[in-house]
Amino acid sequence: MTTATISAKGYTNEDGILMSRYSIRCNDIPIAADKRPTNDVQQVAVEQFGRISARSIGEIVAVIQALEALTDASVCAAVDCVSIHVSTALAWKILTQPVSTIAVHATHARHCHEQVHNLLDKLRPSMTIEILRTKGTTVIDSRMI
């Protein structure tokens, strides 16, 4: 079994721009990575919710970008299991809970939920998907979906 490990992070840079960064590794070898500003819709989250909450949105946007990369056949050709590592409560909730658990007014989170689960549905037939919630290097919760 070949496992692809996705690490994702959202952060605001020194200019206050919401950024997302991800890496995908197989057997400790990097196979894909990217760092970029999130799109304009997500940038509104910084203005609406503040930097800390916006970082949670940035993290889930990074997960979305990584899952999009995994749908590329050249990236995932030998992968049959995906392990997604997230640290924020919002990313964990979006990945593991139904959309009904997300507040109706949290439109950014609901949009991300839809995007994530559409991508997971594409990957699920050929891959096992594991979600890990981490704090530093410690795994505090895990779930197979």
Label for each model-derived stretch:
Residues I60:
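Catalytic phosphate/metal-binding cores of nucleic-acid and nucleotide-processing enzymes, i.e., regions
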Residues M1-I57, E68:
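RNase H-like nuclease fold core
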